[in-house]
Amino acid sequence: MKKDIHPNYVEFNATCSCGNVVTTRSTIGKDIHLDVCSACHPFYTGKQKAAETGGRVDKFNKRFAAIGKK
């Protein structure tokens, strides 16, 4: 690698709105603030709400179920 052409790869803190702080390394060189992280995101905490199970396919099947039974 050539010297003095690569950006500095330094440690920085990513602070979430829930208060969780993650230390990682990057070339941005300054601390950042996150809206969500793995400690408070509903997918990772298990508090995720199920999406609507019925959709267009279910509506189609209900509408034409009687025709298919003949």
Swiss-Prot record:
Oligomer status and interactors: Part of the 50S ribosomal subunit.
The name this protein goes by in its record: Large ribosomal subunit protein bL31
Binding-site list for Zn(2+): 16, 18, 37, 40
GO cellular component: ribonucleoprotein complex; ribosome
Bound cofactor: record note: Binds 1 zinc ion per subunit.
NCBIfam families xrefs: L31, PRK00019.1, PRK00528.1
GO molecular function, one term: metal ion binding
Family: Belongs to the bacterial ribosomal protein bL31 family. Type A subfamily.
GO biological process, any: translation
